[in-house]
Regions:
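Membrane-embedded alpha-helical bundles of multi-pass transporters/translocases
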Residues: 3-210
Length: 210
């Protein structure tokens, strides 16, 4: 019945959020343990990646979602696969130049936007390197969000929860390894940004198989 279906979806979404927050808490704790300013650097780097996705990725999703949702609701699997393939191709075409730019110019970007007042050159460089080493996250992140919308359109509420579980597990493992991979506390946050990216890579792979 509708009540049972709604209840199951609500439980799946709550579980999704709880798993996601677990990953965030662990990342924040590891970052703070390495360096007091690392959590802010990590958050700023993540926000910088959200800007191009918010402009380009959301636009692509908005353009393709009506057709994709309609085909998913109709149970037309072949059409959904075609739409998903198209969305993936458009994502690559739109975001690859931005990934290249942010990878190559992460430090100048951070210095231009953040280096003022108490935010010194060293902090800006740390942020810039974090942006550079995590810029690749944009593509798997966009693909994961595209996959999630497909599964929600098909009312497969638990599938996104399995995907976020894979993302978070990968992220936690790599996050816990980060302090062991460098003797420089300033570099831990850079590895945490990279760990976040590989988490979404695993999510994109899982979503592709499902």
């Amino acid at each position: 019945c509708i009540r049972d279906r709604f209840g199951g979806m609500a439980l799946a979404i709550i579980t999704y959020v709880a798993i996601s927050q677990l990953g965030y808490v662990i990342t924040s704790r590891v970052a703070a343990y390495a360096d007091a300013g690392a959590p802010l650097v990590y958050q700023n780097a993540w926000l910088m990646l959200q800007v191009p996705y918010g402009v380009i990725g959301v636009t692509l999703l908005t353009a393709i979602m009506p057709r994709l949702s309609r085909n998913a609701a109709d149970g037309d699997v072949d059409a959904v696969v075609r739409d998903l393939t198209l969305g993936s191709k458009l994502t690559f075409i739109a975001l690859i130049p931005i990934v290249i730019f942010m990878t190559g110019f992460g430090v100048p970007i951070a210095r231009a936007l953040f280096q003022y007042g108490a935010y010194g050159a060293e902090s800006a460089e740390q942020l810039g390197l974090t942006i550079s080493f995590s810029a690749f996250t944009l593509i798997p992140y966009a693909l994961v969000l595209l996959h999630l919308r497909v599964f929600y359109a098909r009312e497969e509420a638990w599938t996104p929860t399995f995907i976020i579980a894979g993302i978070t597990l990968t992220k936690i493992v790599l996050t816990l390894l980060a302090p062991l991979m460098t003797s420089n506390p300033d570099r831990v946050v850079i590895l945490l940004g990279t760990a976040n990216g590989f988490g979404f890579v695993s999510g994109a792979v899982i979503g592709g198989f499902l």
